[in-house]
Amino acid sequence: MSEKFFDYYAKYAQETPDKVLLRIDDNELTYAQFMEKTAVLGSALKKIGIGEDDKVGICMPNSIEWFVVYWSAVRIGAQPVPMDPQSGSLELSKLIPATTSKVMFITEKYRNNNIIAAISALVPSQITLERVVCFADNNLIPNDDCYISAEKFMAEYGSSDCDIYEPEYLHTLSLACTSGSTGIPKLLSVPSGGFLSTQKDMGDYLEFRADDVMMLGMTLYHQGGFGMGQQMVLKGGTVMYQPQFNPVTFLETIQKYKVSIIQLTSTLAKVLLSTPDFDKYDLSSVRISYWAGEVLPKEIADIFVEKLGIRVVNVIGSSETCTMVVWDSAIDNGTDPSDFKKLSFTDVRVIDENKNDVAEGETGELLVYTDGVITEYFGNPELSAEKILTDEQGRRWFCTGDLVNKLPGGIVRFAGRSKRIIKRGGNLVHAEEVEACLLTHPKIAAAAVTDEPHPVIGQQIVAYIQPKGEEKVTRGELARYFDGKLSAYKVPDKVVLVEEIPKDIGKIQFKYLRKKEYK
């Protein structure tokens, strides 16, 4: 059997049982408590018939409970399926059947999204759930045999007797979720051994230590935020998240707990730097700032390196690959943070449309090899064959869809994305999914969604709308209409009413929409 995550958890639970593994606000989970709680919940899952390769849905925000549910599923050989807790009923109606989840763990709500209501709105015959376990007050849980409180679930079915599953190297650890170009879910089969290997390698590169405390801005339910935290846990350190990002408490937490590693996106950094009295916070304990998820402007990197004296490590990664390439101020300071090099445990190619390597100075698609490249898109063999290539050595390469310039010295410069994806803050928004929801609005005849630059969130969502007749549509009206259907961050930031959506051979001509004289 291959090495597994639980080997590390069990080791640290024995060596440092009372050490805090995870802290979210004032809630703490020690290494010993982690082993105890995953045993109880894992045994409860087994008691209701969940076992090897069964899928366990999780629709919850950052919390101790989220972490315990995830690893309880892994402990018994089942596969956790983290879902964005901002997901509405339309998204969940596609996502849950696609995952084949038998049981789902939820909280009452997250932000303005009522998760219990979203699940309850689904037609039972259209989803696969046999049981919904709720971390909520009993009076909020539907009076239905399918629903049960988490407290009752563990009391009735749980015990302290739960063996740890022994996975093969390629056994699927979890299904990571992301939307496809039409909003149809893409489900990523994350390999257990490969994911462990890449997280260990990255933790070694960053020189993480057992006495480190890491504060993450990204969420647990995003593969990046989860994986970066695991890099620290594998060293026996402490990881910290917030239920929701708050710049003041983020800075106060760094100061209070002497945080040594902070994980940020460019958007979060802009918010932090604009916090009143930012200079009064003591950040002297921070030795590394770890960046992912968005383009990192040189101006922001320079503030952290030169003004704050903090090492900047910027990575391009994806849910399909884990870490891919890196820019590290300890080595690359003075160059653009969008100029990346491969790591010792990764490999890259830059190819043209015929899958041939391009020459230096040319632009092509980035191909990446790591041990952590997904084994497949679950339930989608066509997409798997298109995006995952296997070489003569049996190594899996991922076609990222990222466009890069191939520069001398093995450097690749990020140039953009080949897909119609809007990077709004730390979230990926597929324009086609927003268009599809807009077209269900009774006042809208046609719609086209694109992006435009935004000084804080990077890109904002722009919806060009052709109303029916003399109807008027406002952003506020769309926000109310989207509520409960799609995640709140998918609501268009800007609405432009037009007389007609210009098309050519059925395709929207965005270049005309963007011209001011057309609006």
Language-model-derived ranges and their functions:
Residues 342-345, 356-389, 427-429:
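Conserved ATP/PPi-binding loop(s) of AMP-dependent carboxylate-activating enzymes
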Residues 2, 18-63, 67-71, 88-93, ...:
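Conserved AMP-binding/adenylate-forming core of the ANL superfamily
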Residues 87-97, 104-106, 262, 370, ...:
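AMP-binding/adenylate-forming catalytic core of the ANL superfamily
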Residues 309, 373-401, 418, 435, ...:
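Conserved ANL (AMP-binding/adenylate-forming) active-site segment centered on the GW(Y/F)…HTG consensus within
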Residues 151, 234, 259-264, 273-335, ...:
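Gly/Ser/Thr-rich phosphate-binding loop
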Residues 30-32, 173-197:
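Conserved AMP-binding A3 loop
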Residues 17-18, 133-134, 152-177, 184, ...:
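Conserved pre-ATP/AMP-binding loop-to-beta segment of ANL
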Residues 196-213, 221-261, 275:
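Conserved AMP-binding/adenylation subdomain of ANL enzymes
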